[in-house]
């Protein structure tokens, strides 16, 4: 990889990361204004600066303790450094070297601001994550409770199967989560950056070194080797304990919420916190998707099959089945919402659309699972054969369709085989383009299979033990399927972000949050603006009128999303921020695949290291995309 300038900023390569001492030294000679320390060395309040700068506690580009001022060394000596900083003038805002004459204009320098301040609603996004945590705890907790109940009753067969479908998927997912942590925290990921200046990064200004010399705000910036080892060891111990306790996903959810809140509090580093949150949220959603179809789906079929065989529906197995079903539907809705939110070439899914999506999945999966349980209660061997045949057919269909998710051919085939497991239970879009014909074919096959499995059970069942629920079970299978398809048509016809819904503009905060009305851009997409203030949402693929802009000017926006606005210079021209671009020398993957910098840990490492070097922000661009993917500030080739 190499990094180069596009003419708007200073070219920086990875080799230059080893010469930051010289960069700081040259800044000192020029007498540039200084700033505070990094990694808690400035004694600033939590959240005053980005947690994505180099942490001088552990010499890494990501501090896993959260905000940089919440590092261990900062917590130990926070008050003395704060008083020294106040006496030395160290409480001034941090400024990058040479930035005095090129700061982006404030909101007052742009277009006129609304008379009433915009009301942000962090509760909606926080509530979504809190509900995801509750669904997770409810699913796993009821399964463990049910396994313990089987053990107390002496039903060791059901106890073993129930516990197996809880522990094995959890161990696999926690191993993958810990592997991602290792990649992000070592040289293979975000990594320890060798050769960093102990006096602080150049973006902190030359005063950092002078402050350290006189006991000012930079005095804590030089971490001794022992302190660095202690901090890194504490991070490793913390993450190891978290994953051994099978709580890796819980930690990622909490960290996602923290970064999202910080993206709203910290206007100076809003973009960095926002994308750190997007990376973390993407990771936890992919982990949850994998665990759900390895744990919740088999668990749901197992418990329904046990209840049918025993001809009894006790409270605890029913609760476990309901939570497993809810977990499946929730994860699918959350995954698709996040995938759309992460792509600038697609409109975001509203919360109303996500809710309808959730119930669509809830009903179709219910129909599928009930038919599975009915058939498996009599034909266990044939049910296993059916599942294997269906999985092979779906995997072949997906491979034949030509997906574009992974970097290599064999990884793509493995991914398609995993998606084939998802196709056993529900539809999962993996290819760009119109999906109506593929969905019609899939749901026709599913309806045929559900009907065949259910009627085979009905004709071969024991009438004496099943007459009480045979007809209601048949009704459940077909009514649930029809309800799910109806909700799917409602979603695609009315609530889909690109669907033919009514052209209604948001007139209130609630309407905007629920409908997800896209806001018009102020400037051309090729000149993305510095974020940090709530203005308009860049939607490069859709032209809008000035009337639409006036209608949406006073609405509030969903939190945890950076909405760039286009401030103007006194001359009336759009402000073009300085700085190079991240240029990824590979074609951009088509929707519904993730962008490469979400799934490729090397690209994440590149972005985070480049993010450390220069504070200005411009954008990211893929090789075949004429539009800028708004993110950071460099042009890098892979």
Swiss-Prot record:
Gly residues composition bias: residue spans: 33-43
Transmembrane residue ranges: 127-147, 158-178, 315-335, 369-389, 410-430, 439-459, 470-490
Cross-referenced InterPro entries: XK-rel, XK-related_scramblase
Superkingdom to which the source organism belongs: Eukaryota
Keywords assigned: Cell membrane, Membrane, Transmembrane, Transmembrane helix
Chain intervals for the UniProt region annotation (Disordered): 24-43, 82-117
Topology in membrane: Multi-pass membrane protein
Any one annotated GO CC term: plasma membrane
GO terms of biological process kind: apoptotic process involved in development; engulfment of apoptotic cell; phosphatidylserine exposure on apoptotic cell surface
Subcellular location as annotated: Cell membrane
Any one Pfam family match given in the protein's UniProt record, by short name: XK-related
Family listed: Belongs to the XK family.
Full protein name: XK-related protein 6
Organism: Rattus norvegicus
Gene: Xkr6
């Amino acid at each position: 990889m190499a990094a180069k300038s596009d003419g708007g900023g200073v070219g920086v390569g990875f080799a230059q990361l080893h010469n930051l001492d010289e960069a700081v030294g040259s800044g000192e000679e020029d007498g540039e204004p200084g700033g505070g320390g990094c990694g808690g060395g400035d004694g600033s309040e939590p959240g005053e600066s980005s947690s994505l700068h180099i942490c001088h506690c552990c010499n890494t580009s990501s501090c896993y303790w959260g905000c940089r001022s919440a590092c261990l060394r900062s917590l130990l000596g926070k008050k003395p450094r704060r008083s020294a900083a106040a006496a030395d003038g160290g409480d001034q805002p941090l400024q990058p070297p040479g930035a005095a004459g090129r700061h982006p204009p404030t909101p007052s320098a742009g277009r006129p601001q609304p008379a009433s301040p915009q009301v942000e609603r962090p509760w909606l996004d926080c509530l979504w994550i809190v509900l995801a945590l509750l669904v997770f705890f409810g699913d796993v907790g009821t399964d463990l409770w049910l396994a313990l109940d089987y053990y107390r009753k002496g039903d060791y067969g059901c106890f073993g199967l129930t516990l197996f479908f809880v522990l094995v998927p959890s161990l696999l997912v926690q191993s993958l989560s810990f592997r991602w942590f290792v990649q992000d925290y070592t040289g293979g990921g975000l990594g320890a950056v060798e050769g960093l200046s102990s006096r602080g990064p150049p973006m902190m200004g030359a005063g950092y070194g002078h402050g350290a010399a006189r006991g000012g705000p930079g005095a804590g910036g030089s971490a001794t080797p022992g302190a660095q080892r202690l901090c890194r060891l504490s991070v490793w111990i913390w993450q190891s304990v978290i994953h051994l306790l099978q709580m890796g996903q819980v930690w990622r959810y909490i960290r996602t919420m923290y970064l999202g809140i910080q993206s709203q509090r910290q206007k100076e580093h809003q973009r960095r916190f926002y994308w750190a949150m997007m990376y973390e949220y993407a990771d936890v959603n992919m982990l949850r998707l994998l665990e759900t179809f390895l744990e919740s789906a088999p668990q749901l079929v197992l418990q329904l099959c046990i209840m049918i065989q025993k001809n009894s529906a006790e409270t605890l197995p029913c609760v476990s089945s309901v939570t497993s079903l809810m977990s499946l539907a929730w994860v699918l809705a959350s995954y698709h919402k996040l995938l759309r939110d992460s792509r600038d070439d697609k409109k975001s899914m509203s919360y109303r659309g996500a809710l309808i999506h959730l119930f669509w999945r809830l009903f179709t999966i219910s129909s599928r699972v009930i038919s599975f349980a009915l058939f498996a209660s009599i034909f266990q061997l044939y049910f296993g054969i059916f599942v294997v045949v269906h999985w092979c057919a779906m995997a072949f269909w997906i491979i034949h369709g030509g997906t574009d998710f992974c970097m290599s051919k064999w990884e793509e085939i493995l991914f398609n085989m995993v998606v084939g497991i998802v196709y056993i239970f529900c539809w999962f879009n993996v290819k760009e383009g119109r999906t109506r014909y593929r969905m019609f074919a899939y749901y026709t096959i599913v309806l045929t299979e559900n009907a065949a499995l259910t009627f085979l059970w009905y004709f071969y069942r024991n009438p004496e033990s099943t007459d009480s629920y045979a007809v209601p079970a048949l009704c459940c299978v077909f009514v649930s399927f029809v309800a799910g398809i109806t909700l799917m048509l409602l979603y695609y016809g009315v609530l889909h972000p690109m669907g033919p819904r009514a052209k209604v503009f948001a007139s209130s905060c609630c309407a905007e949050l629920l409908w997800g009305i896209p806001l018009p851009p102020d400037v051309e997409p090729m000149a993305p603006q510095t974020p940090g203030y709530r203005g308009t949402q860049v939607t490069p693929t859709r032209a809008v009128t000035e009337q639409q802009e006036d209608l949406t000017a006073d609405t509030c926006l969903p939190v945890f999303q950076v909405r760039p606005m286009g401030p103007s210079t006194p001359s009336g021209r759009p402000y073009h921020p300085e700085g190079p671009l991240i240029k990824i020398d590979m074609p951009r993957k088509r929707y519904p695949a993730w962008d490469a910098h979400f799934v490729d840990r090397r690209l994440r490492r590149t972005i985070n290291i480049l993010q450390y070097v220069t504070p200005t922000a411009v954008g990211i661009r893929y090789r075949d995309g004429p539009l800028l993917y708004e993110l950071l500030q460099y042009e890098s080739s892979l």
